[in-house]
Amino acid sequence: MLKGIDQRLSAEIVHVLMLMGHGDDLVICDVNHPAATIAAETTYGKLIDMAGCDIPTGAAAILSLMPLDTFVPAPVARMQAVVDRAEGRAVTIESLERFAFYEAAKRSFAIIRTADSGPYGCFILKKGVVDLPEL
């Protein structure tokens, strides 16, 4: 365990968030999503499980570390309430048709599957840049 990192974030999830660059996409999905099949086609190449966690809780944990991209009009596809709260600002969300979402997911950096059983609860987050003060 480390200070300041949500306990729901495994070492693998933190590792993937660190590997991602700005503009990379991260998929967070429910258990109904064909995640294992699609994850094989992502940059990371394998599925990451976030067991025991629903999508709102998982998204909040991930967004506690990962900034959203501010250089694109819609850095998120789906789920407004959790994203706005984590970012502290209103975030435009893009809506994608089911099969268009699957294609976009294949181009993502990685896929994290939660234990959420709600249908079509998946979304994509585009990573932004952390603005650090100069030393």
What are these regions (language model features)?
Residues 1-51:
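Long, hydrophobic N-terminal alpha-helical segment
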